[in-house]
C-alpha cells in the first residue's frame, strides 16, 4: 500500500506536540487562571494565524501571477451559507465551533486537569472517541463491525485501568479525585465530541471550489482564517460569558477562575512572556495547525483519506501524554499498568486502521422515483445505513445515493432488504466507485 | 448550481479522459466507475449557460467519450 509518509509525519508531530500540553500547563494552574491561559493562547494564536494567512496570500500572489488568490473573495465567502451545517452563514459556523467546540472543550479539559491528574484526564480523550463512535452509529453513518466493537472494548478496558490506577495514585498522594473533576471531564468529552463532529462540516462556495481547482494552496489561508476567526471569536465570547458567571448568585470553582482572570488582565503582558504560554501558542497551536493544514492540502489519494488517518493517529496524543506524564512529571502510574494501557491503545490504533481499510465499498445508486414522493422518500432513504448523501436530480434519474458500506453483505442488505421494499422506487441502477480521482 | 455527468468511454482511454476532465477547473470531483458508466464527474457552475459553455467547449471535445448523461442537482441531503 502506498503511504503518504511525508504528511503522515505531520499528523504524528502535531499529536506529539499536543501531548505535552497537560505537562506544560499543570503547574501553571496554581499561579494563573485557566481563563487567562485560554485567552492568551487562542487570542494571540488567532492573530498570528490570521497574519500568516494574509502573508501567504501575498507571497502566493507575488510568486504565482497565474494562480492568484483573491483576499476579497476569501472574506466574501464568510457570508456563504454552510449547506453542511444547518445552512447557517460560515462566520456563524466559525463562532459556534470557536466557542462551544474549541474554547469550552479546552476550558473543561483544563478544569478537569486541575481537579484530577494527567493520566485521569486521558480518560476524557478516550471517552470522546467512544462518544463519537456511538454518535456515528446513532445516525447510521457507521456500523459496529467486529473491529469497531473490539476497539471500543479496548478503549473501555484502558479507561478502567487508568481509573483504577488514578484512584490508587490519589490515595497514595492523599489527594482524592473529586467528583467535580469527573463532571468536568464528561463535559470536556461532550464539547470535544461536538468539536470533532462539526469541525469537518465545512462547505465550500462555488467560487471557492473554482479557486481550489485553480490553486490547491487556496485551502491553506482559508483554513488558517477559519481557525483564526474561530479562536478570536471564541475568546471574545468568553468575556461576556465570564461576566455572566461572575454575577451568578452562587459561587463555584468557575467563579474563582473568572475573578482571577479579571484580576490578571492587568499583568497580561507579563504572563504572556512565560515560557509555558509561549509553548502553548507556538508549539501547541500555531505549528500543529500549520502542519495539519499542509498535510491536508497535499494529501495524495491512497487507500485512506486524510480524515481517516487523522482519526486513527489521534490516539497518539493520549498514549504519549500518558508516557510523558510518567517520565517527565512523575505522575503515579506503575510500569506494568502503563505497558498494558499502551499495548491496548496501540491495538486500538491497529483495529481502527483495520476498520477503515475494511470499510471500503463505495457506490453510486441511481433511482427513478414515483411522482409526488421525492422529498419523503429522500429523507427515509437517508436514514438507511450506508447512505451518506443523497442528491436530488433533474434528468433521467431522480435521486443519486452516495453509498459507503463495510461489506458486500451490507450492500446486498441495503439494496435487497431496504431499497427494494420501497414501492415508490421505480428503477434502480448501481455504479460501483473504483477510484476517486479528484 | 451543481451537476453530475456520467460518461461511457471507448477502449483504453480512461486514464487520458480522466486527466483531461481533472484539468477542467469547474469540475470538482472525478471518479472511475464499474457499471453502465465508466466515469462520473461533478461540476459546479453559476448558471445553466455556463454549464453549456463548459460542456460544449471543453468536455465535448475530449476524445474517447462515447456517450454522456447529465443530471442537474436540485437539492442535497447529508447525514
Where are these regions (language model features)?
Chain B
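A compositional/biophysical signature of low hydrophobicity enriched in polar/charged and small residues
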Residues: 1-79
Amino acid at each position: 500500500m502506498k503511504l503518504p509518509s511525508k504528511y503522515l509525519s505531520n499528523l504524528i508531530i502535531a499529536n506529539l506536540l499536543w501531548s505535552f500540553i497537560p505537562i506544560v500547563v499543570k503547574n501553571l494552574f496554581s499561579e494563573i487562571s485557566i481563563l487567562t491561559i485560554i485567552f492568551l493562547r487562542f487570542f494571540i494564536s488567532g492573530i498570528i494565524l490570521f497574519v500568516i494567512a494574509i502573508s501567504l496570500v501575498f507571497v502566493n500572489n507575488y510568486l504565482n501571477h497565474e494562480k492568484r488568490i483573491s483576499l476579497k473573495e476569501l472574506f466574501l465567502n464568510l457570508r456563504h451559507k454552510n449547506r453542511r451545517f444547518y445552512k447557517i452563514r460560515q462566520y456563524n459556523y466559525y463562532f459556534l465551533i470557536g466557542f462551544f467546540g474549541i474554547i469550552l472543550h479546552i476550558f473543561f479539559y483544563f478544569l478537569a486537569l486541575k481537579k484530577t491528574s494527567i493520566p485521569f484526564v486521558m480518560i476524557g480523550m478516550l471517552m470522546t472517541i467512544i462518544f463519537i463512535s456511538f454518535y456515528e452509529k446513532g445516525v447510521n453513518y457507521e456500523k459496529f463491525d467486529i473491529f469497531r466493537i473490539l476497539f471500543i472494548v479496548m478503549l473501555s478496558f484502558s479507561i478502567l485501568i487508568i481509573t483504577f490506577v488514578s484512584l490508587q495514585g490519589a490515595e497514595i498522594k492523599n489527594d482524592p479525585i473529586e467528583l467535580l473533576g469527573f463532571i468536568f471531564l464528561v463535559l470536556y468529552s461532550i464539547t470535544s465530541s461536538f468539536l470533532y463532529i462539526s469541525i469537518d462540516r465545512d462547505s465550500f462556495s462555488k467560487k471557492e471550489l473554482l479557486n481550489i481547482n485553480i490553486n490547491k494552496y487556496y485551502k491553506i489561508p482559508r483554513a488558517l482564517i477559519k481557525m483564526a476567526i474561530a479562536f478570536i471569536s471564541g475568546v471574545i465570547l468568553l468575556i461576556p460569558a465570564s461576566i455572566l458567571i461572575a454575577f451568578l448568585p452562587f459561587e463555584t470553582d468557575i467563579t474563582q477562575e473568572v475573578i482571577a482572570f479579571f484580576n490578571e488582565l492587568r499583568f497580561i503582558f507579563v504572563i504572556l512572556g512565560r515560557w509555558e504560554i509561549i509553548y502553548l501558542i507556538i508549539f501547541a497551536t500555531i505549528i500543529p495547525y500549520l502542519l495539519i493544514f499542509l498535510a491536508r492540502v497535499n494529501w495524495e489519494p491512497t487507500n485512506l483519506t486524510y480524515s481517516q488517518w487523522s482519526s486513527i493517529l489521534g490516539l497518539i496524543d493520549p498514549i504519549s501524554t500518558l508516557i510523558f506524564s510518567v517520565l517527565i512529571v512523575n505522575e503515579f502510574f506503575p510500569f506494568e499498568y502503563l505497558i498494558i494501557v499502551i499495548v491496548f491503545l496501540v491495538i486500538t490504533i491497529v483495529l481502527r486502521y483495520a476498520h477503515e481499510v475494511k470499510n471500503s465499498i463505495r457506490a453510486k445508486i441511481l433511482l427513478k422515483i414515483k411522482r409526488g414522493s421525492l422529498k419523503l422518500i429522500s429523507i427515509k432513504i437517508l436514514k438507511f445505513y450506508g447512505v451518506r448523501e443523497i442528491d436530488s436530480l433533474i434528468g433521467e434519474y431522480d435521486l443519486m445515493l452516495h453509498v459507503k458500506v463495510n461489506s458486500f453483505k451490507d450492500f446486498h442488505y441495503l439494496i435487497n432488504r431496504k431499497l427494494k421494499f420501497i414501492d415508490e422506487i421505480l428503477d434502480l441502477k448501481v455504479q460501483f466507485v473504483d477510484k476517486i480521482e479528484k | 448550481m451543481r451537476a453530475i455527468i456520467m460518461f461511457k468511454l471507448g477502449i483504453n482511454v480512461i486514464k487520458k479522459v480522466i486527466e483531461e476532465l481533472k484539468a477542467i477547473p469547474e469540475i470538482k470531483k472525478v471518479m472511475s466507475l464499474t457499471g453502465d458508466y465508466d466515469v462520473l464527474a461533478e461540476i459546479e457552475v453559476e448558471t445553466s449557460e455556463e454549464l453549456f459553455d463548459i460542456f460544449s467547449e471543453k468536455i465535448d471535445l475530449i476524445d474517447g467519450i462515447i456517450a454522456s448523461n447529465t443530471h442537474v442537482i436540485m437539492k442535497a441531503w447529508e447525514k
